[in-house]
Each structure stands twice: as C-alpha cells, then as structure tokens.
Amino acid sequence: MLWKGFQKPKRLAFDSESLTDKYGHFWAQPFERGFGTTIGNALRRVLLSSIEGAAITAVKIEGVLHEFQSIPGVVEDATDIILNLKQIPFRLNGDAPKAIYLRAEQPGIVTSGMIETDADVEILDKDVYIATISEGGKLDMEMRLKKGRGYVSADKNFDEDLGLGFIPIDSVHSPVRKCNYSVEAARLGQITDYDKLSIELWTNGSVNPADALGLAAKLLKDHMNIFINFEEEIEASHAEDRKPEIRNENLNRSVEELELSVRSYNCLKNANIQTIGELVQKTEAEMLKTKNFGRKSLNEIKEILASMGLSLGMKIDEHGNAVAPPPGSQPAPSYGGYPGSYGTGGTFGGGGNYGGGGGFGGDNNPGF
C-alpha cells in the first residue's frame, strides 16, 4: 500500500497534573514530517467552530422595547446587560430550547447565580456580573437558551415562536474558548525528522477538553469517510509468534506511566487501581463493571499490557512474579503490528526506551 512504512502515533498522551474540566494539554508522536501541522490545524479549526454548546439567543426585559434602551433604576442599559449575559457559560441537557428567568428587586449587584433554571440547565459560573440595581429599581428578564454551533447572528436567532417583547441577540455557542497547537521535531531511533504535535485546549467547562478533542477528531473522520473508495487492509501482526516475556519491574510501576487516554486513566483512578501489578490482576469482566469503562478503554489497556508482555487476568505469586492466565482464556492482543515494546522494555510513553534515549512522551519530558 502507498502508506506502508508510515509512522503513526499509537495513542494520545496528556499532562495529568494540569488536566482540569477547563484545560488540557495533549500531544502525540511520531508523525511523518508535515502531518503534525496538517492534523493540528484541522483539529484547531474544528474545535473553535464546530463543537456544540448552549448560549442565550433571545432576551425579554420588562419595560424594554429594543437593545439600546435604558432601564429605570438599573446602572447598565440593555446593551451592556446583553453583553454581560453572553459571558455566562451554560450546560444544557437535551436538544429543546429552554426558558430561564432573572428577577431582582433589591438594590445591589446582580450575578448569574440569581438566574432561575430547571433541572436541564446548569450554570457553570455563578459569579458572572450582569448588572447593578439602584434604590427603587428592578430587573425582570426572560431568556431563551438554545444549543448551537459556533457563531450565530441575531437574524438567524429570530424564531417565529418568540413571544412579544423578545430581542434576538447574536450568540457564540462554542464551548472551546481557546486552542493552540505547536509542532516540534520528534526522534524515532536515530531519525529526528518526525513531528510531535502538541495541543493546548481551554473550554468553558460545559465540555471537558478531552471530550472536545475527541469530538473534533470524530467529526473530521466522519467527513473523510466519503473519500475512501477501497477496503482497508489489516496489518499482519507478528506478535503472536513471540512468547511474551513478563518483566517483573513493570508490576510496581504506576498506571500513570502507561500513557492512557484521559477516559481510561480516570476510570482506573476511580477504581483505585494505582499500579500495573494491581491492574493485571483484574479480569476483563471486572474492568467492564467499572463506571464509564467501555470496550474501547478495555482494548486500549489490553494493547498496552500486551506490549509489555502482560495481560489482564494474571496472578501474582509469592515471589512477586506474574503468572499468565490459562491459554485461551484471555488471549493478549497484538499491539498495532509491533511485536513488543519500542526499544528496551516499557511502553510507548512509559518507563522504557523508544529506540533509546529515555522515556518517550511522558508527562513532563519528551525523552529525546
């Protein structure tokens, strides 16, 4: 095939120490030269424009007929209030638009935490400033919250079913606030002209960075499928021809060194699985019972363990040695098309070498 010999990353690495609901730092390597920029730019554009989110699309303020009108007893006019409303991050469960309300009659500062919602709407930041009410003033508003993608103009937010007095406003639905990517040189063995792609991602909290990145990649993949006019060939694996060697030193290593996806890592963390030794003693059935742990995460973990000569369902004997499960009970899958680890022991991004020169793609050092 035309792409025979192409180097492709095996998994996405991330910085577990800095990962939050609003920020994530991810990287992958090695890419063939030029692919880092191609993929990074495409992902960034999709992340900023096409991830679905909720935003206020229309506002009705008591006593206000248009957005340039002032409100008696309120410091801000309608325009300033609308601008402040656009800064509030929401999470909307379900696809139907929702009506939310704000009623304030006491003098003082009005914030997003004073908005009345139902169970399907979550205000992610309750401290966003909206307005200040003076003595004798009041603020009574009804707002329409709606899902969408990217930027939507006020004209497109006008619906026939909007009640009298509603002012359509332009809205920004994207939960991704900022996205940067960078490409630097990566080394594979003695070859140094591969790409390492790093992506930094900030969201408003309605979607966590890992899920946003996954959605963007899925959207790109779905659009590319129509260009594929042939059946994909499955790479032949030679791993089954080799008898895996169990490395006892791996059993005491932390699962953080496995360079798992964010979802798989969080599942192990929630299951209180700290070391590789604890992990290999779990069966497939036990792992699938873990909350949010699916078949994709299971296959990912099995592949990583297989590259280390380990598998799920193993027993640890009195000498600390891992004993493989009975033949045929849980066959360890091959890893990509590679018979074992890259270099000397360990995994891609783990404690071993990637063609020499230290760990490849750990949390803090590239290991070149």
Swiss-Prot record:
Enzyme nomenclature, EC number: 2.7.7.6
The reaction(s) this protein catalyses: RNA(n) + a ribonucleoside 5'-triphosphate = RNA(n+1) + diphosphate
Leader sequence segment: none
Alphabetized GO MF terms: DNA binding; DNA-directed RNA polymerase activity; protein dimerization activity
An example Gene Ontology CC term for this record: cytoplasm
UniProt-annotated stretches for the region Alpha N-terminal domain (alpha-NTD): 1-231
Keyword flag Protein biosynthesis: no
Alpha C-terminal domain (alpha-CTD): region residues: 243-368
Source superkingdom: Bacteria
Pfam family, one: RNA_pol_L
A Gene Ontology biological process term: DNA-templated transcription
Keywords of this entry: DNA-directed RNA polymerase, Nucleotidyltransferase, Transcription, Transferase
Enzyme class: transferase
Disulfide bond entries: none
Annotated family: Belongs to the RNA polymerase alpha chain family.
UniProt comment concerning the protein's domains: The N-terminal domain is essential for RNAP assembly and basal transcription, whereas the C-terminal domain is involved in interaction with transcriptional regulators and with upstream promoter elements.
Subunit: Homodimer. The RNAP catalytic core consists of 2 alpha, 1 beta, 1 beta' and 1 omega subunit. When a sigma factor is associated with the core the holoenzyme is formed, which can initiate transcription.
Function: DNA-dependent RNA polymerase catalyzes the transcription of DNA into RNA using the four ribonucleoside triphosphates as substrates.
Full protein name: DNA-directed RNA polymerase subunit alpha
Organism (species): Koribacter versatilis (strain Ellin345)
Gene: rpoA
